[in-house]
Amino acid sequence: MGVFTYETEFTSVIPPPRLFKAFILDADNLIPKIAPQAVKCAEIIEGDGGVGTIKKITFGEGSQFGSVTHKIDGIDKDNFAYSYSLVEGDALSDKIEKISYETKLVASSDGGSVIKSTSNYHTKGDVEIKEEHVKAGKEKASHLFKLVEDYLLANPNEYC
C-alpha cells in the first residue's frame, strides 16, 4: 500500500470560530441547503456526531458519484481542527483503499482564516494517484468552500 499526500490552502475573510461552526460542525445541514447539486443529504449511520461517528453523504444530481461513507477521526473545537476518513463509496476506486482528510483553520493577520487541508490517499498496491484526479477534487472543494463563505457574508448573524 502506498500513501500519497496532497496539501491545499484557502483563505477567507471569515474568522476561524465562525467558519469552523458553519463549514465543519454544521456542514451536514448547511451544504445540502446551499449546494443541493453537490450534496443531497448527510446522515449519521452510527455514533453521536463526535469522534468515531460514521456518516453517509449522498451527492446531488450534479455529482459524478452517488454516495460515500466517512468516519470522523478527530474534532478539536478549541484549535479548529477536523479529520475524517472516506472509507466506502463509489469515489473510492479499485485502486484506493481509503482517503484521510485533515483540515485546520488558523487566524490570518487580517482577521480572517487560512484553511489548511491535507489529503492522504491510501492506495492498494503500488498504484499512483493522477494529479488531475486530485486537482479536480480540489477545485470542487474550493467551489463548495466559496459557497459557504458567500452564505456567511450574506447572513452575518448566523453561526456567530
Swiss-Prot record:
Q: A GO term (biological process) for this protein?
A: abscisic acid-activated signaling pathway
**Protein name as annotated:** Major strawberry allergen Fra a 1.04
Q: What superkingdom does the record give? A: Eukaryota
Lineage, opening ranks:
Eukaryota, Viridiplantae, Streptophyta, Embryophyta, Tracheophyta
Q: Which GO terms describe its molecular function?
A: abscisic acid binding; nuclease activity; protein phosphatase inhibitor activity; signaling receptor activity
Q: Which GO terms describe its cellular component?
A: cytoplasm; nucleus
Query: Do you know which PROSITE patterns this protein is assigned to?
Result: PATHOGENESIS_BETVI
Sequence similarity: Belongs to the BetVI family.
Q: Please outline how this chain is modified post-translation.
A: Phosphorylated in vivo. Phosphorylation prevents its activity as ribonuclease.
| Gene symbol of the encoding locus | Fra a 1.04
UniProt KW keywords: Allergen, Hydrolase, Nuclease, Pathogenesis-related protein, Phosphoprotein, Plant defense
What tissue expression does the UniProt record report for this protein? Highly expressed in roots. Expressed a low levels in ripe red fruits.
Is Nuclease given among the entry's keywords? Answer: yes
Function text: Possesses ribonuclease activity in vitro.
Q: What is its EC number?
A: 3.1.27.-
Q: Signal peptide position in this chain?
A: none
Species the sequence originates in: Fragaria ananassa
A Pfam family (short name) is Bet_v_1
Whether Oxidoreductase counts among this entry's keywords is: no
